[in-house]
Amino acid sequence: MRAPARGTGCCGRSGGRWLAGAAQPRCLWAGGAGQRFMVPGGTMKSLKKDSRLRITPTRLLEASENVKEKKRAKGPEQPTPTIQEEPEPVSNVLQGDDILALAIKKEDLKEQHIPRLTEKEDKRVITQKFIIRKLKPMDPRRKVCHLVARPANPDEATKPLDYSGPGDSFDGSDQILPHHILGSLQDFKRIALARGNTQLAERIPTSPCLMTLISAEGESKQKAPKEEKRPPWAPPPQHNFLKNWQRNTALRKKQQEALSEHLKKPVSELLMHTGETYRRIQEERELIDCTLPTRRDRKSWENSGFWSRLEYLGDEMTGLVMTKTKTQRGLMEPITHIRKPHSIRVETGLPAQRDASYRYTWDRSLFLIYRRKELQRIMEELDFSQQDIDGLEVVGKGWPFSAVTVEDYTVFERSQGSSSEDTAYLGTLASSSDVSMPILGPSLLFCGKPACWIRGSNPQDKRQVGIAAHLTFETLEGEKTSSELTVVNNGTVAIWYDWRRQHQPDTFQDLKKNRMQRFYFDNREGVILPGEIKTFTFFFKSLTAGVFREFWEFRTHPTLLGGAILQVNLHAVSLTQDVFEDERKVLESKLTAHEAVTVVREVLQELLMGVLTPERTPSPVDAYLTEEDLFRHRNPPLHYEHQVVQSLHQLWRQYMTLPAKAEEARPGDKEHVSPIATEKASVNAELLPRFRSPISETQVPRPENEALRESGSQKARVGTKSPQRKSIMEEILVEESPDVDSTKSPWEPDGLPLLEWNLCLEDFRKAVMVLPDENHREDALMRLNKAALELCQKPRPLQSNLLHQMCLQLWRDVIDSLVGHSMWLRSVLGLPEKETIYLNVPEEQDQKSPPIMEVKVPVGKAGKEERKGAAQEKKQLGIKDKEDKKGAKLLGKEDRPNSKKHKAKDDKKVIKSASQDRFSLEDPTPDIILSSQEPIDPLVMGKYTQSLHSEVRGLLDTLVTDLMVLADELSPIKNVEEALRLCR
């Protein structure tokens, strides 16, 4: 075998030979098996020995460099040109020993590869014992760290403080979490970026909201794939109720099956199902409790009805009373029935429960069976709504729905033209519609029903429906649903077909405005070859909600079923989408909250009504009506003036009571009644109902009228008050009194109170117009018109004279100061004090005599008169002080003639006598006996008079000064003398 080409397998000059005398390298590697190489200048043994050595490339390069340097060094030493000698011819043929030397031995392979021990070989286990010293770990709790402060080396350069902490303080994560640092991550990142530490800033995660903002700013990022639109009928993803129910139901089934196998019991007898009948038992107990009070045995009689006693918590004074429940008050709630439908029981793996025969349960009690029979009629009346739970079960889904139903009308049996053989053959086809072998002649399987050619056909059957396929669709508006109809040619003849729409009368033809197509399918004509299966796909889609129908006829040639129609009925229901679901939920939550608040409020009100004391009956509306209010109500356009209205009252009494006085003057003429008096009585009888007050007529009952009238008459008899006319309420009660006979004249002397004016000018005018005397009528009309004119004028607003009031108050202060100084002088000089005695004298009806008199009595009294006088003095002094205070409070209202307070002050007036002599001479009183005065020293009396005069001068000087100042402040232009005159 020859050596390989130059430059392959050996290192040296490519394509050349080694120079003479140079160190010739040996072969670095051997060829594969079966190749032999001849190495010049060496033997087989040296080649075998050198083949085991490894020469690195670095050593090879060093050797080549050494050869080149030797060549360069020998160049100048041999100036004479060298004679090139021809090298000896090298034989490239390998000898036998060389071939054996190139063979690979196992020993060489073992030296190159370390042998591995196999698992099958026995391993020698060498055990050695070593003693290892193990230190006891220190308790970390006892470790104490001490910090020792030492002065820093001044030569060391100060380093900036680093607050980032150790490098591995982030729990081995690449990100910096909020609990790694003090403060917020945003501030930390901002400071790191300000310092240029971007590597640290990148380790801070960005919050989702910031990522959203960054992406919204316009970063070119790849958009996420669009989520597939979920159908509107699908529930939200978080509402996986059905999945949870199915998972829990499957776990429950496995659990109860395992328990049933382990305990050797049926599923219905497991302990986990013993409470299934508890609800039914409770309902029956409640129903029996409701019917028990109707029995005569009086069971639960005391605590079950509205006649039961109230329960007290505590005593009757400070405790609480428990109100009755709704059931005790007769407001029983209907019994609620709760059951499990059959499908739920099957789904949960709970069959119909049957109690074991050896168990004596509550239902098998003989007493209960007897009670049921006894109370059966009443229980049926109370619990009349026995619902069938299985019948109330609703099973359905909100997904698009489509269904195909087929009706085969046997109209061919009535065909007169068809033979019995054809009829029998058709029945055979109908019974064996799934026969795979073809039928001779034209034949179709229309929606699974056979439709074949009939030899003889009846013309009457051509308009009859042979096979009707109903396709039903149900979906939401805007959604699409589909259904398929299959037609198979199971005959031996090709059949041509086409579609024709049938016209159906529509009741609401006028109401349909648009004729939009909603059913879609391939209605082109075509041919069905023998053995071919043709599938027609029908689609339905509607943009509006409603019920839609279409009827199509599948026509064939040749005609099948003797000319009967192969009909396809399309019926679809499009439902409205719930686009306001969110708004409805919000509204439902608001209504639920409002309902809860309303229920709580009603419950609280009901509880409070059962606990709180009922409110006191309010006073009637017209209890505080005054004469002015009644006048304004009955005369809206007029204005009330007290003096004018009083004059009208006086005019009424003057002319309306005149006939009554005339009747009293002639007591013997009672039987003779003039026609004028009769006419006047009838007119007054007509006017009497009109005088009644419309305000208080429906509010004051008759017993109260009588009680008030009796109390008024009793007060009149006592004599405490004897007013000339009654109060406003008494007038109303007298007018409303049913005791006054409408047929009697108000002037008849029956002892009844005289009819008063009802404050209505129109009634006044009518009463004046029926007066018999013309002169009286003219005079009354003239005065009435004059009063009406005065009442038509709007009253001027009252202006209070502040200067007059202040002057009067200053004058009263001067008098009080003078009296106080006089009493002080008398006490200092030892003079006797003056006493004032007030006496109440009864006042006659039309006289104004002074009811209160002032008597000055010296201190030197003796006996019973002195004690009596002192007691009367204390009593009357207290009355006087009260009246003075009352007068000071009502000072600003004294000059108001229209004030309401003047009505009660016409009865009493306080008048003081000018002097004691006038009282003793003109109106002597025998009940008072004055004792003789004690002698007074004239010198002391002179000092008293002189001091009193000087005090009067000082008080008057102060009064005049204050009056001048006030006059200048209030009205500087007004004459002060006029104010002084007014004060007098």
UniProtKB/Swiss-Prot annotation:
Localization, UniProt: Cytoplasm; Membrane
Domain of life, source organism: Eukaryota
Lineage of producing organism: Eukaryota, Metazoa, Chordata, Craniata, Vertebrata
Keyword Membrane: yes
GO function terms (MF aspect): clathrin binding; phospholipid binding
Tissue-level expression: Expressed specifically in testis.
Coiled coil feature spans: none
Comp. bias intervals (Basic and acidic residues): 218-231, 862-910
Subunit and interaction comment: Interacts with MYCBP.
UniProt keyword list: Cytoplasm, Developmental protein, Differentiation, Membrane, Phosphoprotein, Spermatogenesis
General function of this protein: May play a role in spermatogenesis. May be involved in synaptic processes.
Major localisation: cytoplasm
GO CC, alphabetical: clathrin vesicle coat; cytoplasm; endosome; plasma membrane; synapse
Residues with Phosphoserine modification: S619
Positions carrying Phosphothreonine: T613
Stored Pfam families: MYCBPAP
Gene3D superfamilies with a match to the protein in the record: Immunoglobulins
Region (Disordered): 61-88, 218-240, 693-729, 842-917
Gene name linked to the record: MYCBPAP
Name this polypeptide is given: MYCBP-associated protein
GO BP term (any one): chemical synaptic transmission
